[in-house]
Regions:
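Active-site cradle of extracellular carbohydrate-active enzymes
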Residues: 1-52
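Well-ordered alpha-helical scaffold segments within catalytic/enzyme domains
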Residues: 1-13, 55-71, 115-130
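Active-site rim elements
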Residues: 42-48, 69-76
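Sec-exported extracytoplasmic/periplasmic mature domains
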Residues: 8, 24, 28, 63-70, ...
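Non-transmembrane alpha-helical segments in soluble domains
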Residues: 4, 17-20, 59-62, 87-91
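Solvent-exposed, flexible loop/coil residues
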Residues: 42, 54-57, 76-79
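Aromatic-rich carbohydrate-recognition surfaces in CAZymes
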Residues: 51-55, 62, 83, 87
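CBM-like carbohydrate-recognition segments
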Residues: 72-159
Length: 159
């Protein structure tokens, strides 16, 4: 995500292409399951927080790197994995995390979710008012260091 943002800022097309290719051919196919979940994250001690972080980072990649010719928001792997599917999977558990089907995070469970960037980016990309509405309701200025550390974009509206 950081490489993509710096590459775009500096106009480094080679690195932007590298990041886009890595998203399509490494990150999305290897980190997302067919249902849109992130199995590597759901096996960790903080599966909820890390799943959110992973989706935030991927959504930010889509936001930073998408062009008319290469729209990562619309990209889908041959086996159906996409950022849209990832958002659709996690969204219900942002709305009501008591329905989270995996173990609770061992720490900071009560601090999540906050105003996650994937919600506002996804709302814009997919014209989904529900994503924006829930984003507006969530905490926009978290105070817990662990939450701040795992919130890759704190002001998504400027992106």
């Amino acid at each position: 995500m950081q490489v993509a943002a710096f590459a775009k800022f500096t106009g480094n097309e080679k690195m932007m292409d590298f990041c886009s290719d890595r998203y399509k051919n490494v990150l999305l196919p290897n980190q997302m399951a067919a249902d849109g979940s992130f199995p590597r994250e759901t096996r960790r001690t903080k599966p909820y927080g890390y799943s959110i972080f992973n989706l935030d980072a991927m959504a930010t990649l889509c936001q930073v790197l998408s062009t008319k010719e290469n729209n990562l928001w619309e990209y889908e792997t041959t086996d159906g994995k996409s950022i849209k599917k990832g958002i659709a999977f996690l969204y219900p558990f942002i709305v009501d995390k008591t329905k989270w089907p995996f173990q609770k995070d061992v720490m900071y469970w009560d601090e999540w979710p906050v105003a996650q960037p994937f919600l506002v980016f996804g709302a814009m990309a997919f014209n989904n008012k529900e994503y924006l509405d829930i984003w507006k309701q969530l905490e926009h200025d978290p105070k817990v260091d662990e939450v701040i550390r795992n919130l890759p974009v704190r002001n998504p509206l400027i992106w």
